[in-house]
Amino acid sequence: MRNLLPALLLLAAASARGAETAAFLDIGVGARGIGMGGAYTALADDSSAVYWNPAGLARAEKREVAVSHAELGAGTREDFLAYAHPISRGTVAAALTYLSQGAISGRDATGRPTGDFQASDAAFAGAYGLKTEYADLGASVKYLRSHIASSEAQGVAADVGARRAFDGAGPGKLVVGAAVRNMGPGLKYDTQRNDLPLRVAGGAAYSFSSGRTLAFEVQTAPRGGGADAGFGGEFKVMEGALLRLGWSTKSAAPAGSGFDAARGLTVGLGLERAGFLFDYAAQAAGELGAAHRFTLGKRF
């Protein structure tokens, strides 16, 4: 039963939004953004912006490669690989997201075991962030592939985003951003086609000269209704070392899960040295315990 929990929770999240599929597209990637409660649409300026907001790629000054691994509980794992390459008027990037749920116990309509089956999802993305005079713009195209037992579905999706920074806004810098994620015709398993988790997100982040950053974000689901909010902070504790704290309504643990006192709480750590970046984040995951994410990157 425990191996079935990740699938049930993903399906429940999709059901709450309506008949959606490919729920893995709404989980989030990278330890920095998750450590800040998912309030990253405005702040994203690294290779993980391929997921959060492709406009955040626009002003990358160096090439970056990053790999991220997440243990989401009960054998469910998420891996993310991205590469960003600055060009004359912006940055191009490519990324792969892969979610594996391992072996899941199958049962028929009467509850009798039918043997284990596998489930996995993948998204291959190409993105471009463009610098303009007034705002940075970005777009990405994704090829999607989903596999559940003997059923398989393929499809395409697209994201668009915008981002603008206001230097000299008081003692620091203000950044605002917005993105529309997972636009597309959905995925078709056998004869039924389900919608992708279309999301519209907008937020703001303020970075102080002291090294502190505060961020806020709201995300809506136009098809199924409902909204989520995220708050996060990043604090410089010494040169090259950052602590992060966040809270998200989307990642809040369900009541009675044993994690009520920490519902929605995320914590993280960031280290940077000689162009290498290491980030870690943890978030409450209800009955699955705590989800852990690790990201290793290199800028050159």
Place the predicted regions along the sequence by residue:
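Outer-membrane beta-barrel porins/channels
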Residues: 18-37, 41, 62, 70, ...
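Positively charged n-region of N-terminal signal peptides that target proteins for export
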Residues: 1-4
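Short helix-onset patch at the extreme N-terminus, typifying the N->h transition
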Residues: 6-8, 24
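Hydrophobic h-region of N-terminal signal peptides that target proteins for export
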Residues: 8-18
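Single transmembrane alpha-helix segments in multi-pass membrane proteins
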Residues: 32-58
